[in-house]
Curated annotation (Swiss-Prot):
InterPro entries with a match to the protein in the record: CCA_bact, HD/PDEase_dom, HD_domain, NT_sf, PolA_pol_head_dom, PolyA_RNA-bd, tRNA_CCA-adding_enzyme
Taxonomic placement: Bacteria, Pseudomonadati, Pseudomonadota, Gammaproteobacteria, Enterobacterales
CC cofactor note: Magnesium is required for nucleotidyltransferase activity. Nickel for phosphatase activity.
More about this protein: A single active site specifically recognizes both ATP and CTP and is responsible for their addition.
UniProt GO molecular function: ATP binding; CCA tRNA nucleotidyltransferase activity; cyclic-nucleotide phosphodiesterase activity; magnesium ion binding; phosphatase activity; tRNA binding
Residues noted as binding Mg(2+) in the record, renumbered to the chain: 21, 23
Residues covered by the HD domain: 226-327
Domain of life: Bacteria
This protein's name: Multifunctional CCA protein
Cleaved signal peptide residues: none
Annotated function: Catalyzes the addition and repair of the essential 3'-terminal CCA sequence in tRNAs without using a nucleic acid template. Adds these three nucleotides in the order of C, C, and A to the tRNA nucleotide-73, using CTP and ATP as substrates and producing inorganic pyrophosphate. tRNA 3'-terminal CCA addition is required both for tRNA processing and repair. Also involved in tRNA surveillance by mediating tandem CCA addition to generate a CCACCA at the 3' terminus of unstable tRNAs. While stable tRNAs receive only 3'-terminal CCA, unstable tRNAs are marked with CCACCA and rapidly degraded.
Keywords from the UniProt entry: ATP-binding, Hydrolase, Magnesium, Metal-binding, Multifunctional enzyme, Nickel, Nucleotide-binding, Nucleotidyltransferase, RNA repair, RNA-binding, Transferase, tRNA processing
Length: 415
């Protein structure tokens, strides 16, 4: 029995990145021998065991053979006779097919170290094409390692382009899991660009793919193309926040523009509310968690309103705050502001512009929140009157605050 460290732990160690978890492959062992040594069997479909002390995963060396469609259509064969090289051959990319033995020696039959040095994401063998989920995995690795200048090998991209027919067979949960993990990387926009380059975006995210080729007014969008703007917005969101809900919301914020009749281009009046049903359909299909869905829909509906925040009347501001439920969920306002700032700065030439609307909305919410329902009830109001009076007083507080702001600005100009 021989044990080897494999996969991401070896790869990340070679890249001098933090190693978050370690996976092992065991050659020359049977399930009975693993159990006898105290390992716990956890693999439903594969012979995977947990170490009795470290709780790290140890998998028996295995091979896989295609038996049907999709990512589940495989027959696995695990046996003490399966070699390390055979086990590594079934892996997706050469950089993930390197093993390290207990003396620190690297076993690298598919030149993964060379591809790490040259920054290539390259498939190990043609068996790569048997699992459509690998299209998403490669796109995720491209996003994860974009800051290290990794790129997809041309022959791997060509193979990915041939695999799009099986993508609709992927379970929505698997598509979302890869997407969710990608949204947490520093360059999530690369994932969606790779999916577009290989033809997978149209199959998996048709709502986003439809934005490419849809023009916006050059005055406000020098990049013109709404698809390009969307990816720029996702990129900007990743610079502004680690919150994947905000990042996902920026992906969806302009999907309504794909519904604009061509004769109205490049104007997209009302695209925000129009996009809400599109966002809801996308989220339902991919089983996106409700908190992310809810933020994405309100960002789609209201992001244009936030861009003109300073010109909103106190009445409209209170309506906006109520619509996005910030009284009960104050953190949502910050998410909305970040998504809208990413939208405003996700444009060619606007990347370093300030977004004063953000501080204006934060201050406006602070002023409105200073009026409480307790104050209204103490003044003798009850029932439905409480809500009406609360809104009136909050509008009054905002009106007074806005006048002070305007007077202060006037005095500054005169000085």
């Amino acid at each position: 029995m021989k044990k080897y460290l494999v996969g991401g732990a070896v790869r990340d160690g070679l890249l001098q990145l933090p190693v978050k978890e370690r996976d092992w492959v065991v050659v020359g062992a049977t399930p009975q021998e693993m159990l006898a040594q105290g390992y716990q069997h956890v693999g439903k479909d594969f012979p995977v065991f947990l170490h009795p002390d470290s709780r790290e995963e140890y998998a028996l060396a295995r091979t896989e053979r295609k038996s049907g469609q999709g990512y589940t259509g495989f027959i696995c064969y695990a046996s003490p006779e399966v070699t390390l090289e055979e086990d590594l051959r079934r892996r997706d990319l050469t950089i993930n097919a390197i093993a390290r033995d207990d003396e620190g020696n690297l076993i690298d039959p598919y030149q993964g170290q060379q591809d790490i040095r040259q920054r290539w994401l390259r498939h190990v063998s043609d068996a790569f094409g048997e699992d459509p989920l690998r299209v998403l995995r490669v796109a995720r690795f491209a996003a994860r390692f974009a800051h290290l200048n990794f790129r997809i090998a041309p022959e791997t991209m060509a193979l990915m382009q041939q695999m799009t027919d099986e993508l609709p067979l992927l379970a929505p949960e698997r598509v979302w899991k890869e997407t969710e993990r990608t949204l947490a990387t520093r360059n999530p926009q690369v994932y969606f660009q790779v999916l577009r380059d290989c033809g997978a975006l149209k199959a998996l995210f048709p709502e986003v793919d439809a934005l490419f080729g849809v023009p916006a007014p050059a005055k406000w969008h020098p990049e013109i193309d709404t698809g390009i703007h969307t990816l720029m917005t996702v990129s900007m969101a990743a610079r502004l926040t680690d919150d994947i809900a905000v990042r996902f919301a920026t992906l969806c914020h302009d999907v309504g523009k794909a519904l604009t009749p061509r004769e109205l281009w490049p104007s997209h009046h009302g695209h925000g509310p129009a996009g809400v049903k599109v966002v809801e359909a996308l989220c339902q299909r991919l089983k996106v968690p409700n908190p992310l869905r809810d933020l994405a829909t309100i960002v789609a509906r209201y992001h244009d309103l936030l861009h003109g925040a300073q010109s909103l009347t106190p009445k409209t501001l209170i309506k906006l705050f109520s619509a996005i439920d910030v009284w009960r969920r104050p953190a949502r306002l910050e998410q909305m502001i970040l998504a809208s700032e990413a939208d405003a700065r996700g444009r060619t030439g606007f990347e370093n512009h300030a977004y004063p609307q953000g501080d204006f909305l934060r201050d406006a919410f602070r002023v409105a929140s200073s009026v409480s329902a307790r104050d209204v009830m103490a003044a003798g109001f009850s029932g439905a009157q409480i809500g009406e009076e609360l809104n009136r007083r909050r509008q009054q507080a905002l009106a007074s605050w806005k006048r002070q702001q305007e007077n202060s600005d006037t005095e500054t100009i005169q000085d």
